[in-house]
Regions:
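Alpha-helical transmembrane signal-anchor/signal-peptide segments
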Residues: 26-42
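A short acidic/glycine-rich loop-to-helix N-cap element
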Residues: 134-159
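Solvent-exposed, acidic/flexible segments
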Residues: 37, 41, 47, 150-157
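Short beta-strand segments enriched in hydrophobic/aromatic residues
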Residues: 132-134, 168
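Hydrophobic membrane-insertion alpha-helices, especially the h-region
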Residues: 5-23
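Glycine-rich portal/gate segments that line the openings of hydrophobic small-molecule binding cavities
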Residues: 4-8, 42, 49, 53-59, ...
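Soluble periplasmic/extracytoplasmic beta-strand elements of cell-envelope proteins
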Residues: 36, 127-131
Length: 176
């Protein structure tokens, strides 16, 4: 009986300690990547706004077959919602310099994906930023797993921005 009490007390203290340490990790995580592109915001938004184009530049969709993607809520010929194997992606807002989409996977919290085009006065290039916002619960396993987000999402975001850069700059050179 003493051994059982010791085990229960030890597990409880360990859980409380791990939970207390996890509270040092923020509840809001933003992963962000940026690159300079020799293009106008319009040329960048042509790639980002059209969900049909995402398979061409977004590495998160490079291995997805077209028959697993369902588009809906079309406005001006461009879908506003995309479903990929149960994951829903929907445009939340499109401002002049920032576009935000919500990615919702069943059983998980929504992830905000945002793209910004930042113009520089006197420059022929813009900075394109892609960010992902994660809002975490207090659960220790969620908090500690967030430490791996940078390594799992960051390189793919860089690759995606590189693809956008190539496509937007290629569009620009084909017009000149």
């Amino acid at each position: 009986m003493r051994l059982f009490k010791l085990l229960i007390i030890s597990v409880t203290i360990l859980f409380l300690l791990v939970t207390a340490i996890s509270l040092l990790i923020p509840f809001h995580i933003r992963i962000s990547r940026a690159t300079n592109v020799l293009a106008t915001p319009t040329e960048v938004w042509q790639q980002v706004d059209d969900m049909h184009e995402w398979r061409n530049w977004n590495p998160f969709f490079s291995g997805v077959s077209p028959d697993k993607i369902n588009y809906s809520d079309t406005v001006n010929g461009k879908p506003q919602t995309m479903n990929v194997s149960g994951t829903s992606i929907q445009w939340k807002e499109m401002k002049r310099d920032e576009h935000i989409a919500i990615m919702q996977k069943p059983g998980f919290r929504p992830i905000l994906n945002g793209w910004k085009c930042i113009s520089h006065t006197g420059s022929d290039s813009i900075t394109v930023q892609w960010y992902m916002d994660f809002h975490l619960r207090w659960y220790p396993w969620e908090k500690f797993s967030s430490l791996l987000f940078e390594q799992s999402y960051g390189p793919k975001m860089e690759e995606g921005l590189g693809n956008i850069k190539k496509m937007a700059e290629a569009d620009r050179t084909s017009f000149n």
